[in-house]
Amino acid sequence: MHNYLDFEKPISDLEGKIHELKKLASEDESIDTSDEVGRLEIRVRESMADIYSKLNAWQKTQVARHPQRPHFVDYAKALFTEFTPLAGDRKFSEDAAIQAGFARFRGQPVAVLGQEKGNDTKSRLKHNFGSARPEGYRKAIRILEMADRFQLPVITLVDTAGAYPGVGAEERGQAEAIARSTEMCLGLKVPIISVVIGEGGSGGAIAIAVGNRVYMLEHSIYSVISPEGAASILWRDSTRAKEAATNMKITAEDLKGLGIIDGIIPEPLGGAHRDPQTVIAAAGDVISNALGELSSRSGEQLRSDRRQKFLNMGRNL
């Protein structure tokens, strides 16, 4: 069952009619609905193309949060072989919001990490909806340290509304853990490729997204705070989230124009959730090309380029 967003009502209506016609034909073989179904399918594609060519920032936010959008585990299964997950931060506990380990990417050994939101109630609770606690970022630091030691490229897949803001997380040093993870990314002498596959929220995202190359899926978002949070701070009114999203410049197109990201990975018509295999394959090709481009650079150059890239953002924006 497809979950339709509020602006997709024309698509929902048309696909509802298609479903009814197909059901009618299946119940009575004497009824041929193929011509009408074909016409409606053309109208669906036309309607989808029209709607998705004009999405505003708030609508893209809704697409980025779509519950059926492919998550870290979907990318991990499709892009990597011999994935060996690691658990625990060796200080306090395990945090399933961040998944991390080692794998082969098209035959090349790599370190992989990213946030996992989960896809049903049980898994969402297990992964804390992708909002990591300090233990998650300290686990990420463990993986990053080992990647540097064994000279393995790092691939990060970002999908979080932000780090978990609970009292316990703050007591155990949430801000420090995020800062240390960011610092670790800046210091590595191996390539780091980061892809925002859904939401890239605040320090919780950038803690694992300080890459030599940073990409975003076409309908993903990347921001210092959620639109609802920004609206609450600026206007004391979270219902103005749509206005905040527009002003915050959080879309892939906005951030590419500002020089924050290096490229945009196109999504299938209707969003990544409509055709996960296609968008995952496209992301894999972009990652592969980036690794090929960076493989000839020395460790010192990779580290220097990465630091300069992020320093320039602060100086020029």
From Swiss-Prot:
Catalytic activity annotation: N(6)-carboxybiotinyl-L-lysyl-[protein] + acetyl-CoA = N(6)-biotinyl-L-lysyl-[protein] + malonyl-CoA
EC numbers, comma separated: 2.1.3.15
The keyword Lipid biosynthesis appears for this protein: yes
InterPro entries associated with the record: Acetyl_CoA_COase_a_su, ClpP/crotonase-like_dom_sf, COA_CT_C
Assigned GO CC terms: acetyl-CoA carboxylase complex
HAMAP family given in the database record: AcetylCoA_CT_alpha
Function: Component of the acetyl coenzyme A carboxylase (ACC) complex. First, biotin carboxylase catalyzes the carboxylation of biotin on its carrier protein (BCCP) and then the CO(2) group is transferred by the carboxyltransferase to acetyl-CoA to form malonyl-CoA.
Family statement: Belongs to the AccA family.
GO molecular function: acetyl-CoA carboxylase activity; ATP binding; carboxyl- or carbamoyltransferase activity
Enzyme class: transferase
GO biological process, one term: malonyl-CoA biosynthetic process
Domain CoA carboxyltransferase C-terminal per the UniProt entry, residue ranges: 43-293
Record protein name field: Acetyl-coenzyme A carboxylase carboxyl transferase subunit alpha
Keywords, ordered alphabetically: ATP-binding, Cytoplasm, Fatty acid biosynthesis, Fatty acid metabolism, Lipid biosynthesis, Lipid metabolism, Nucleotide-binding, Transferase
Subcellular location: Cytoplasm
The protein's assembly and partners: Acetyl-CoA carboxylase is a heterohexamer composed of biotin carboxyl carrier protein (AccB), biotin carboxylase (AccC) and two subunits each of ACCase subunit alpha (AccA) and ACCase subunit beta (AccD).
PROSITE patterns: COA_CT_CTER
Pathway assignment: Lipid metabolism; malonyl-CoA biosynthesis; malonyl-CoA from acetyl-CoA: step 1/1
